[in-house]
Swiss-Prot record:
EamA domain sequence ranges: 44-113
Protein's UniProt name: Probable 4-amino-4-deoxy-L-arabinose-phosphoundecaprenol flippase subunit ArnE
Protein's cellular compartments: Cell inner membrane
HAMAP family assigned: Flippase_ArnE
Coiled-coil segments on the chain, per record: none
Similarity annotation: Belongs to the ArnE family.
Protein role: Translocates 4-amino-4-deoxy-L-arabinose-phosphoundecaprenol (alpha-L-Ara4N-phosphoundecaprenol) from the cytoplasmic to the periplasmic side of the inner membrane.
Keyword flag Transmembrane helix: yes
UniProt gene name: arnE
The species this protein was found in: Pseudomonas fluorescens (strain SBW25)
Keyword Transmembrane found: yes
Top-level taxon: Bacteria
Amino acid sequence: MITLLLLLAACLLTCMGQVSQKFAVESWRDLPEGWALKLRSPWLWSALVCLGLGLLVWLLVLQRLEVGIAYPMLSLNFVLVTLVARFVFHEPIDARHWLGVALVISGVVLLGRHV
């Protein structure tokens, strides 16, 4: 059970890091050229923290699971980021993309039986 919770935590932290990156670059649109102001973005620092913590949790997952099982389960990030893209960023998602999401979920469920 702890392994599944760690895997879920790694997925959520990675997803939050990706979403924070998107918010960071969106917040840069109105900034002048150059990196000085961009590096002060709280979203950028949030992304770094989330991705760093996600890496540490991922290392704990790899201590408990075979990489051939663990890594494909990270594809849940594809599902999570797609949901955020649709409902937070209001990006259009076509039927083929939703089919891909369903297939990823099916694959994760099948792999989850090995955990």
